[in-house]
UniProtKB/Swiss-Prot annotation:
<dbReference type="GO" id="GO:0044208">
    <property type="term" value="P:'de novo' AMP biosynthetic process"/>
</dbReference>
<keyword id="KW-0479">Metal-binding</keyword>
<feature type="binding site" description="in other chain">
    <location>
        <position position="239"/>
    </location>
    <ligand>
        <name>IMP</name>
    </ligand>
</feature>
<dbReference type="GO" id="GO:0005525">
    <property type="term" value="F:GTP binding"/>
</dbReference>
<comment type="similarity">
    <text>Belongs to the adenylosuccinate synthetase family.</text>
</comment>
<dbReference type="InterPro" id="IPR018220">
    <property type="entry name" value="Adenylosuccin_syn_GTP-bd"/>
</dbReference>
<feature type="binding site">
    <location>
        <begin position="40"/>
        <end position="42"/>
    </location>
    <ligand>
        <name>GTP</name>
    </ligand>
</feature>
<dbReference type="GO" id="GO:0000287">
    <property type="term" value="F:magnesium ion binding"/>
</dbReference>
<dbReference type="GO" id="GO:0046040">
    <property type="term" value="P:IMP metabolic process"/>
</dbReference>
<feature type="binding site">
    <location>
        <begin position="331"/>
        <end position="333"/>
    </location>
    <ligand>
        <name>GTP</name>
    </ligand>
</feature>
<feature type="binding site">
    <location>
        <begin position="12"/>
        <end position="18"/>
    </location>
    <ligand>
        <name>GTP</name>
    </ligand>
</feature>
<comment type="pathway">
    <text>Purine metabolism; AMP biosynthesis via de novo pathway; AMP from IMP: step 1/2.</text>
</comment>
<feature type="active site" description="Proton donor">
    <location>
        <position position="41"/>
    </location>
</feature>
<feature type="binding site">
    <location>
        <position position="305"/>
    </location>
    <ligand>
        <name>GTP</name>
    </ligand>
</feature>
<comment type="function">
    <text>Plays an important role in the de novo pathway of purine nucleotide biosynthesis. Catalyzes the first committed step in the biosynthesis of AMP from IMP.</text>
</comment>
<feature type="binding site">
    <location>
        <begin position="413"/>
        <end position="415"/>
    </location>
    <ligand>
        <name>GTP</name>
    </ligand>
</feature>
<dbReference type="InterPro" id="IPR033128">
    <property type="entry name" value="Adenylosuccin_syn_Lys_AS"/>
</dbReference>
């Protein structure tokens, strides 16, 4: 059976949790392959229960599904324990969660440096979540990071923390005028936390490849979105990892030839959290309408999301860089009750039309959207379960997005619930 990659095709917050939940009963494994608790997935179960997940894969809410936090994820031990406790308090079985031995741990000094750096930068800040994600990835690349397996050997953990703080305390004290951290206190804190998760540490690469050999289906669940990718996103306003499909193989330990489907998640309009370019951003009543109807508040940060019309330029770009085979279009219902629904089909930069993503950072910042107006619809579409049950104008809108994006729209979300979905083509096939 296949490995399926699920990725956000915009700037994150597209509705990836809903897609994972819908596929849940057809899956045996769900894997987070990058990012950390700087992103969130919201899942609404058929009984109306709502769960916000930050580190743990969305498959944890489906009985009998095995879940993996992969080697490409950076893990805050305290956040992991808090999230596990919250799920268990609500009756969720968390026994099927494994943590890669090679996943890097977010240490207290990562969070301290992240927060103080953003304050220091002021108006020039990137807009991070302040959760230590970037500094942890910096240590990973610099080969001085702490991995999950290190908590199983106190001597190694102590050596790594002491070496890290020898430099980082200089930064905190001499550059940012903050207090130094005590290495032994950091070690003791992490070892105490490790008591709650060390039994989950595993060679997850081996587990996943054995699962594929047995014919089981594995979903590789990305966080954030294509335009936040450190290589392919709107740099420097990006995250510190690779949410794109290429990062799925690296962050899970599954070979790329095992991947048969790349499912992109597209919101029927566009949103973004934090700083950075956003060509279709709205500052009028339409923007306020989308924000209100769509409940556009960040799951992790609580920050209001910026809103705009659908951007086909970035959708085409996402299709290309990810090799997307199928799209799941979410929140189509939010667009009900609009007379017209504009679609950005190209950009204008300094009087020149760009049908594809501009190459330079300056051009994307100065891009002006070129819109195509589509007739809207006023009907409530939340009860539609087949494509033909949608109003004709809604059907036309979906088909136009499909044409502009360059990949088949296999599923359409018409509400937040698992069952509020139209399936035009099965994803697991």
């Amino acid at each position: 059976m296949p490995a399926i990659v699920l990725i956000g095709a915009q700037w994150g917050d597209e509705g990836k949790g809903k897609a994972t939940d819908l596929l849940g009963e057809q899956l045996q494994w769900v894997v987070r392959y990058q990012g950390g608790n700087n992103a969130g997935h919201t899942v609404v179960l058929p009984n109306g229960d709502k769960f916000a997940l930050h580190l743990i894969p969305s498959g944890i809410l489906t009985p009998a599904v095995n879940n993996v936090i992969g080697n490409g994820v950076v893990v805050d031990p305290g956040v992991l324990l808090t999230e596990l406790a919250g799920l268990e308090e609500r009756g969720v079985d968390t026994s099927r969660l494994l943590l890669s031995a090679d996943a890097h741990l977010i240490m207290p000094y990562h969070v301290a440096i992240d927060k103080v750096t953003e304050r220091f930068l002021g108006a020039k800040k990137i807009g991070t979540t302040g959760r230590g994600i970037g500094p942890c990835y910096q240590d990973k690349i610099a080969r001085v990071g702490v991995r999950a397996a290190d908590v199983l050997d106190e001597k190694i953990l102590t050596q790594k923390v002491e070496a890290a703080l020898e430099f980082k305390n200089q930064v905190l004290v001499k550059i940012y005028n903050r207090k130094a951290l005590d290495p032994q206190q950091v070690v003791e804190e992490v070892l105490t936390q490790a008591e709650g998760f060390k039994h989950r540490i595993s060679d997850t690469r081996l587990e996943l490849n054995l699962a594929l050999e047995r014919g089981e289906t594995v979903l590789l669940e990305g966080s954030q979105g294509t335009l936040l990718d450190v290589d392919h996103g709107t740099y420097p306003y990006v995250t510190s990892s690779n949410p794109t499909s290429g990062g799925a193989a690296v962050g899970s330990g599954i070979g790329p030839t095992k991947i048969t489907t790349v499912l992109g998640i597209l919101k029927a309009y566009t949103t973004r959290v934090g700083s950075g370019p956003f060509p279709t951003e709205l500052f009028d009543d339409h923007g306020a309408y989308l924000a209100k109807q769509g409940g556009e508040v960040g799951v992790t940060t609580g920050r209001a999301r910026r809103t705009g019309w659908f951007d086909a330029v970035i959708a085409r770009y996402a299709t290309r860089v990810n090799g997307i085979t199928d799209y799941f279009l979410t929140k189509l219902d939010v667009l009900s009750s609009l007379d017209t629904v504009p679609i950005c089909v190209a950009y204008e930069v300094d009087g020149v039309r760009h049908d594809e993503m501009p190459m330079s950072q300056s051009d994307i910042h100065h891009a002006k959207p070129i819109y195509e107006e589509m007739p809207g619809w006023w009907e409530d579409i939340s009860e539609a379960r087949t494509f033909e049950e949608l109003p004709q104008n809604a059907q036309n809108y979906v088909l136009r997005l499909e044409e502009l994006s360059g990949a088949f729209i296999s599923c359409i979300g018409v509400g937040p619930g698992r069952d509020e979905t139209i399936v035009r083509r099965e994803i697991v096939r």
